[in-house]
From Swiss-Prot:
Xref: InterPro entries: Ribosomal_uL10, Ribosomal_uL10-like_sf, Ribosomal_uL10_bac, Ribosomal_uL10_bac_type, Ribosomal_uL10_CS_bac
A family per Pfam: Ribosomal_L10
Coiled-coil boundaries: none
GO biological process, one term: translation
UniProt KW S-adenosyl-L-methionine keyword: no
Gene symbol of the encoding locus: rplJ
Family assignment from sequence similarity: Belongs to the universal ribosomal protein uL10 family.
Protein name (record): Large ribosomal subunit protein uL10
Its biological purpose: Forms part of the ribosomal stalk, playing a central role in the interaction of the ribosome with GTP-bound translation factors.
Species annotation: Mycoplasma pneumoniae (strain ATCC 29342 / M129 / Subtype 1) (Mycoplasmoides pneumoniae)
C-alpha cells in the first residue's frame, strides 16, 4: 500500500514539473556515456533547464494527469530521459540535439511546448532553427543595412563635391 502512495506522489511530482515548465523534450539516451550525460547536464544547467530520468510508467501517468494532448504514449518505451526547459525551450532542445546528433543510437521521442505536442521529426527541424540571440542579430543586421547604404551614399555625394 505504501508503494502505491509513493508512486502516486512520484506521478504528481512529475506532472507538476512538466506542467509548470516552458516545455519538455523526451529523448532516448540508450548509448549516452557518463561523460556525455555530465556534458548535457552542464549545458542545460546554463540555460536554467534540467534533465530527469523517469520510469516510463510514471511518465505515461504523469502525461495523462497533466493533460498533455497529442503526445503519442506508445512511443514512451526504452531508456528515456526528459529535458525540462524552465525559461527557453529552444535552447534546451539545441543542447539535447547536440548530443543526439553525435550518437546514432540516440533520438528524440517527442516534446511538448507552446501547448502543442511535437514528434521527433518536428523536434529535429526546430533544433536546426537559429536561437533567440541569433535571430536578434539577424534582425538588427537587416535593419542596419539600409542605414549603412544611406550613409555610404551621403559620403559619396560629399566626396563628389
Amino acid at each position: 500500500m505504501e508503494a502505491k502512495k509513493d508512486k502516486a506522489q512520484q506521478v504528481a511530482d512529475v506532472s507538476h514539473l512538466l506542467s509548470t515548465s516552458a516545455g519538455f523534450v523526451i529523448f532516448d539516451y540508450t548509448s549516452m556515456s557518463a561523460i556525455e550525460a555530465t556534458s548535457i547536464r552542464k549545458k542545460l544547467f546554463k540555460n536554467g533547464s534540467k534533465i530527469k530520468v523517469i520510469k516510463n510508467n510514471i511518465l505515461r501517468r504523469a502525461l495523462k494527469a497533466g493533460k498533455f494532448e497529442g503526445i503519442d504514449e506508445t512511443a514512451i518505451k526504452g531508456k528515456l530521459a526528459v529535458a525540462v526547459g524552465v525559461n527557453e525551450i529552444v535552447e534546451t532542445l539545441k543542447a539535447v540535439d547536440g548530443v543526439v546528433k553525435a550518437k546514432e543510437a540516440m533520438n528524440f521521442v517527442c516534446g511538448y511546448f507552446d501547448n502543442r505536442a511535437f514528434n521527433s521529426a518536428d523536434l529535429e527541424k526546430i533544433a536546426k532553427l537559429p536561437g533567440r540571440n541569433e535571430l536578434y542579430g539577424m534582425f538588427l543586421s537587416v535593419l542596419q543595412a539600409p542605414l549603412r547604404k544611406f550613409l555610404y551614399a551621403l559620403e559619396a555625394v560629399k566626396a563628389a563635391k
